Every structure is written in C-alpha cells, then in structure tokens.
Amino acid sequence: MRSIKVEHYEAFSTVPSKGNPAGIVLDGKGLTDSDRQKIAKEVGFNETAFPLPSERADVNIRFFTPGHEINLCGHATMATIYALKTKGLLPDRDEITIETKAGILPIRLSIDVDRSMMITMKQAAPQLRAFSGSRSELAASLALEEKDLHEELPVVYGSTGTWTLLIPIKKLDAFKRMQPNNQHFPHILQEMPRASVHPFCLETYDQEADMHARHFSSPYSGTVEDPVTGTASGVMGAYYHKYIESSPSLQLIVEQGHEIGKDGRIAVTVTEQTDDVMIEISGNAVLIREFEVRI
C-alpha cells in the first residue's frame, strides 16, 4: 500500500470550519485514475483535486468526488490555486490558465483590502435547460411542499461546467426544513439523472447578499450536501440575469452553508457579451491541516 499526503483546505472563507473543504494532492505523480478515485473516497470530502502538468495551460486540475470524476469544481479550484500560489508552484503573474475537463479557463489573482488573496475564476459558458419533471415530487424530495417553490420563477437545469437543477424557493425559512432524499433525485431528474439539486431564494441572512442557497449532491457522488458551491453559484448568476434582472453587468453575492454550520460567501460577476454572458466567481481559501491516506 502507498501512503498519500493530502492537504485539507477550505474555500470561500478565511475562517477555519466555515468554508467548503477540499482535499488537495500536490504530489500525484504516478497515480492512475483508479488511484485518484480511491484517494477521493478515503478523503471523504465532496471533492478532492489533483493538480497535474499541462501542455495547454499553466496547470491541469482533475476533480474527484468519493463516487466519480467531475468536469469542474469551483471551490476545489479555489483551494488548489491558493495552495499552489502560496507554495510558489505557479508562475509569478496575476493571470494564469487552468486545464479542466470543462475546458481551458482563465484565473485572475489579486490582493483584497484585508491583504488576503482573492481568486477570480471564469466559468465555462452558461447553459440553461428546461425541467419537465414533477414539481410536487421535486418538493417532496426535499421534505417541502409544492407551495414552497416560487410560482413565478422556473425550475431549470443549469451548468457553467457541472450540471445542477436550480430550484427557486419563496421563503428563507424553508431552507431549515429541507431534508433531502438524494436517492430519489435520479427518478425525478429524468432529463439529467446525474445532476445535483440546488435550491435557492432571494431572501438572505446577510443584508449584503443577493441570494441564499443549499446544494444537495447527486447520489452517484457519494456525498449528501455541499457546503459552499462555486460552479452552482456561477450558474445562479446566469439564471439571475435571464429571469430576474438582465443588466449589462451584475455584481452578486451568494451566501450558502448556514444550515450546516458554514458561512460561505461567493462573489459572482455577470457580464453581457455579444451573444452570451460571461460568468466569473471570486473567493479565497485557508489551509486547515495535512494528513495521509493509504491506498
């Protein structure tokens, strides 16, 4: 058996235990995809990232849940870039590129007003697709009633790299009542049975935030809930622009994680382009600890 060093970071917060955890394996030389999957399962976080050399970008990042590989993960990207930058493993410039299975994506690095590193990541082109399943069954899968869903806003699938089902909820208090039946999601999400589920609303705990959300995992991922979700927050920006406020430029704050003891914040920028919108998410990260797993 091999002993693999894993670094535990939390993204979208600078306060330990308040962000979204990700495992980072910096020395992944010689690992097979089967090895990476075993490591992700042993680590047990929603995502574990494996930075690798790239011939097309400054770094290639692979993302694994405990159950399978995914194309892109926002919080694990933030954590990986933070780790590489603070260890001097990235080029000494403010703009870099990363290779992912969602494409080549630009990353911008800056120093925030409190001297913390801010990482801005362009998302893949947003896609929104209709949901034709049962709204009542969907609500029941979250231990809600159909009347908790917003009547004037649509339920749609969305992606800026990873597909999720965006579910507009009327009131903030419904989020404390949610008890997801993840195993039932594929039956309801017939168009995309492997998608995750992302309820959100326009009421927030923080008056400076624009949207509140929770994120429930696909049962195939091996996890139940994601504390603070970058890619889903990005596509929420595209949803907001299409269905709520179609301004040429939007600066949004998404809050997530309160119901499970987290307190994450994700900055989402939406910019109109000629025939689409550009989505960027911004956040930071903090190192928690190092540990080892054996495979």
From Swiss-Prot:
Keyword rRNA processing: no
Enzyme nomenclature, EC number: 5.1.-.-
Top-level division of the source organism's lineage: Bacteria
Catalytic center residues: 47
Gene3D superfamilies recorded: Diaminopimelate Epimerase, Chain A, domain 1
Entry coiled-coil feature ranges: none
Record GO terms (molecular function): isomerase activity
GO cellular component, one term: cytoplasm
Pfam families with a match to the protein in the record: PhzC-PhzF
Cleavable signal peptide: none
Protein's GO biological process: biosynthetic process
InterPro entries: Phenazine_PhzF-like (IPR003719)
Keyword vocabulary terms for this entry: Isomerase
Family (UniProt): Belongs to the PhzF family.
Protein name, as recorded: Uncharacterized isomerase BH1950
Organism: Halalkalibacterium halodurans (strain ATCC BAA-125 / DSM 18197 / FERM 7344 / JCM 9153 / C-125) (Bacillus halodurans)
Lineage: Bacteria, Bacillati, Bacillota, Bacilli, Bacillales
